[in-house]
């Protein structure tokens, strides 16, 4: 049985946001851009701020140029550390598996903009 959604916009339940952001080598805004972080997050929790997140790290420079890492999982954005699964990849990261740890480094509550650090632990062939 599917339960009716709780009418509570504070959790963003039911919302879907697409992303296409710079993927950088380090946290500071002026860090070297190495690709794009593209995907979506959808409000999936009715009683807390929790998202279903699907994201590709698409590399556009260096030895990883043309390769991707694909991430899928639950993202409770106000938790200090969030762990999500690496479900695959392409190019150098073909058949990738592993996990990422996400940590919010900066957040603007007025705009919803954030800088998030992702540490990737990936096994691939």
UniProtKB/Swiss-Prot annotation:
Glycans are attached at residues 8, 30, 65. Disulfide bonds: none annotated. InterPro entries: Allene_oxi_cyc_Dirigent, Dirigent. One of its GO terms (cellular component) is apoplast. Keywords: Apoplast, Glycoprotein, Secreted. Pfam families: Dirigent. One of its GO terms (biological process) is phenylpropanoid biosynthetic process. It is found in: Secreted, Extracellular space, Apoplast. Dirigent proteins impart stereoselectivity on the phenoxy radical-coupling reaction, yielding optically active lignans from two molecules of coniferyl alcohol in the biosynthesis of lignans, flavonolignans, and alkaloids and thus plays a central role in plant secondary metabolism. Belongs to the plant dirigent protein family. Homodimer. This is Dirigent protein 22. The lineage of its organism: Eukaryota, Viridiplantae, Streptophyta, Embryophyta, Tracheophyta.
């Amino acid at each position: 049985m599917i339960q009716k959604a709780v009418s509570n916009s504070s959790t963003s339940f039911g919302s879907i946001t697409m992303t296409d952001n710079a993927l950088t080598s380090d946290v500071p805004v002026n860090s070297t851009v190495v690709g794009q972080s593209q995907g979506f997050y959808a409000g999936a929790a009715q009683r807390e701020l929790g998202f279903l997140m699907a994201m590709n790290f698409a590399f556009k420079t260096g030895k990883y140029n043309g390769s991707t890492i694909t991430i899928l999982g639950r993202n409770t954005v106000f938790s200090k550390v969030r762990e999500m699964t690496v479900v695959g990849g392409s190019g150098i990261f073909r058949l990738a598996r592993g996990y990422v740890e996400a940590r919010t480094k900066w957040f603007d509550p007025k705009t919803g903009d954030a800088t998030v650090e992702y540490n990737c632990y990936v096994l691939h062939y």
